[in-house]
A protein has these predicted regions:
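Hydrophobic alpha-helical transmembrane segments
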Residues: 1-178, 182, 190-247
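Solvent-exposed interhelical
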Residues: 187
Length: 247
């Protein structure tokens, strides 16, 4: 028990340092224009598996589903092994990797940009929200823009900050990289369309499972933050009402 507490304390210290670095530095564009971001590399690995295993001709739905599960298992194992190897670099390496994979400042900047743009006019607001959502924004009204920004902010707070932090605390760099691989795969192949309904369902289900606790913790944190302006009860009521509609 003492050893477990010591490990968690060490990881918590690394996490706090990484959050501070992320908040101070953010996403340095000059760096990522020269070298690929780790998530980009994960995306390339997922694309490789997609091209090699996601064949629709002459393959049944169950076979494609099995291929998709095999693909995500291989990718997760490789990500965890990479994390295990990087763990030997010590807390400094862990802190740098965690800071790179957290997205607190980037999320804050993008959401604030939408809020600022809403004061400048509907056109600017549509452009700003278009930077963080994949849906069409040309016909959005102010209410739609605010709703889209809030939804995206809540989702990315869970996926980009809370979940990576929890998985790092629980599993160190192997847990962190395994989570980021699954989350990236879900964003790329976890769609309910003809191409990915079968092949991507494994990634989508694993992503749901790995986000089960982080998503609920994120919702509670948002409710806690809402108490600062006296809206805690309303936020909690919304969470209880709408939570069943989400994974």
């Amino acid at each position: 028990l003492a050893a477990t507490v010591a490990v968690l304390a060490a990881r918590a210290a690394v996490l706090l340092a990484a959050l501070a670095i992320d908040w101070l530095v953010g996403e340095p564009d000059i760096l990522w224009r020269r070298v690929p971001h780790p998530v980009v590399l994960f995306g390339r690995a997922i694309t490789f598996m997609d091209k090699r295993l996601n064949r629709r001709r002459g393959v049944t739905g169950k076979s494609r589903q099995a291929r998709g599960i095999l693909a995500i298992v291989i990718l997760v194992v490789l990500a965890a092994m990479l994390g295990w190897g990087l763990s030997f670099g010590g807390p400094v390496v862990a802190c740098i990797i965690l800071a790179v994979l957290l997205a607190a400042r980037s999320l804050d900047e993008h959401i604030r940009a939408v809020a600022t743009a809403m004061g400048e006019g509907i056109g600017a607001a549509r452009t700003a929200v278009g930077m963080i959502v994949g849906r069409e924004t040309k016909s959005m009204k102010k209410g739609d823009i605010a709703r889209a920004a809030i939804e995206t902010g809540a989702e990315n707070l869970s996926d980009g900050v809370i979940a990576p932090a929890l998985w790092f605390l629980a599993g160190g760099l192997p847990g962190l990289l395994a989570y980021k691989m699954v989350n990236t795969a879900d964003s790329m192949i976890g769609y309910r369309n003809a191409k990915y309904r079968a092949f991507g369902c494994g990634a989508a289900r694993i992503d749901d499972a790995m986000n089960l606790i982080p998503a609920r913790l994120t919702a509670l944190l948002i409710c806690g933050a809402a108490t600062l302006n006296g809206r805690g009860s309303a936020a909690l009521g919304t969470m209880m009402r709408d939570g069943r509609h989400h994974a």
